[in-house]
Curated annotation (Swiss-Prot):
Keywords: Cytoplasm, GTP-binding, Ligase, Magnesium, Metal-binding, Nucleotide-binding, Purine biosynthesis. This is Adenylosuccinate synthetase. GTP binds at residues 25-31, 53-55, 62, 307, 313, 339-341, 425-427. Plays an important role in the salvage pathway for purine nucleotide biosynthesis. Catalyzes the first committed step in the biosynthesis of AMP from IMP. It comes from Plasmodium falciparum (isolate 3D7). It holds the Pfam family Adenylsucc_synt. Binds 1 Mg(2+) ion per subunit. InterPro entries: Adenylosuccin_syn_GTP-bd, Adenylosuccin_syn_Lys_AS, Adenylosuccinate_synth_dom1, Adenylosuccinate_synth_dom2, Adenylosuccinate_synth_dom3, Adenylosuccinate_synthetase, P-loop_NTPase.
């Protein structure tokens, strides 16, 4: 389906579409972004860094992308990395090389994006080790994301635009590295080696570093079709997520505007990507978590191990109050429900439809969510039960071909969220996607 020219009633359409994760990440955003990139002129990243990850298959070849948007795999597509990102340039160059072709000719990097150095990764590891000893581990990817955003917020970070003038970059680099080595008592760090690498990056990237704000708005005025790719997901947002067990950037719709420099009236449509069950990596509250055989079944059948870290993901039942909270923040217009096939084989499927206070019995107010760890401990899930199905659904091409119990589960989710579920993932391959044409919103 061409997202820029869809025929769904009561849903806006236009030239700017954002695809955002609606849970704790790992929803399977890569597949839908890959499918929709075919219809876009420009694909963008606006937040995060190499702590995100997609594995995309094109013409039977797999590509692991952590910094580049999925549109890089299409020769007619321009790719943009926005100012809200933190970019480990060595990792970026390795990704560019792995994709091959004349990718650099259609890649644009914001001059306001911040550079993530190896020392940020060292600091990340130091901080996480210290927190582990204190029993306060966050469970970061140790990719240096938090420390880089920290230097940005402290106003001592270095932007990509600085790399265009290498002498100026060298001076700023030395001051930053010396400051961080002193602050974190780092005694050994090969500055000369890193500077030599950055001189090569300066030569290769100086013409690709641009004012992305001007670039984006000029292209929007020329009616270019833009697909915006969110990294991580809503419940990892630095403000709205389960703080402090979150990432360091704005992962919700507000990050689109602050991370690309386009204004809110330009965004026409938001697609929320929702896994048919729930997972999270690392620490933090998880009210529907399954520490049992069912949780292990979902982990193994769904291959729930981190793309970036390879860590096993925690698994649990789908959480409607969470999705209603995320919908409030992001104004989600459509949903892509992923990995429905993983639920095949379960005798019973539970859907969390509310939370009840353990002491008072009071139900959670619609649109609210207990993101604080101490508050989340006061609540317990209220479940609606559904019968499972045994059939292999990976060969289903239409909604009506799904088992009755699978259809009931999908329609219940749609009813609670009052948002059309347009795409349903029924298998790992690109073709394993049902496009649903009728919706249950009453």
């Amino acid at each position: 389906m061409n997202i820029f020219d869809h025929q769904i009633k009561n849903v806006d359409k236009g030239n700017v579409v954002a695809i955002l994760g609606a849970q704790w990440g790992d929803e399977g955003k890569g597949k839908i972004i890959d499918m929709l990139s075919e219809y876009s002129d420009i694909t963008c990243r606006f937040n995060g860094g190499a702590n995100a990850g997609h594995t995309i298959s094109v013409n039977d070849k797999k590509y692991a992308l952590h910094l580049l948007p999925c549109g890089v795999l299409y020769d007619n597509n321009i790719s943009v990395l926005g100012n809200g990102m933190v970019i480990h340039v060595k990792s970026l160059m390795e990704e560019i090389e792995s994709v091959g072709g004349k990718l650099l000719d259609r890649l644009y990097l914001s001059n306001k994006a911040h550079i993530l150095f190896d020392i940020h990764q060292i600091i990340d590891s130091i901080q996480e080790t210290k927190k582990l000893k204190e029993g306060k581990q966050i469970g970061t990817t140790k990719r240096g994301i938090g420390p880089c955003y920290s230097t940005k917020a402290s106003r001592i970070g270095i932007r990509l635009g600085t790399l265009k003038n290498f002498e100026n970059f060298k001076n700023m680099y030395s001051k930053l590295i010396d400051h961080l080595m002193d602050l974190y008592n780092i005694t050994e760090y090969d500055k000369e080696k890193e500077l030599n690498l950055f001189y090569n990056y300066h030569l290769k990237l100086r013409d690709r570093i641009v004012d992305v704000i001007s670039f984006m708005n000029t292209n929007l005025e020329n009616n270019k079709k833009v697909l915006i790719e969110g990294a991580n997901a809503a419940m990892l947002d630095i403000d709205f997520g389960t703080y402090p067990y979150v990432t360091s950037s704005c992962t919700t719709v507000g990050g689109v505007f602050s991370g690309l420099g386009i204004h809110h009236k330009k965004l026409n449509l938001v697609v929320g990507v929702v896994k048919s069950y729930l997972t999270r990596v690392g620490c933090g509250p998880f009210l529907t978590e399954l520490n049992n055989d069912v949780g292990q079944y979902l982990r193994e059948k769904g291959h729930e191990y981190g793309t970036t870290t390879k860590r096993p993901r925690r698994c649990g039942w789908l959480d409607i109050p969470m999705l209603l909270y995320v919908k409030c923040i992001n104004s989600i217009d459509m949903i892509n429900l992923t990995k429905l096939d993983v639920l095949s084989g379960l005798e019973e499927i539970l859907l969390c439809v509310n939370f009840k206070n353990k002491k008072t019995g009071e139900l959670l107010e619609k649109g609210c969510y207990p993101v604080e760890e101490e508050i989340s401990e006061e609540y317990e899930p209220v479940y609606e039960k559904f019968s499972g199905w045994k059939e292999d659904i990976s060969t289903c091409n239409e909604f009506d071909e799904l088992p009755e119990n699978a259809k009931k589960y999908i329609l219940a989710i749609e009813k609670y969220l009052k948002t059309p579920i347009v795409w349903i993932g029924v298998g790992p391959n690109r073709k394993n996607m049902i496009v649903k044409k009728n919706f249950n919103l009453n």
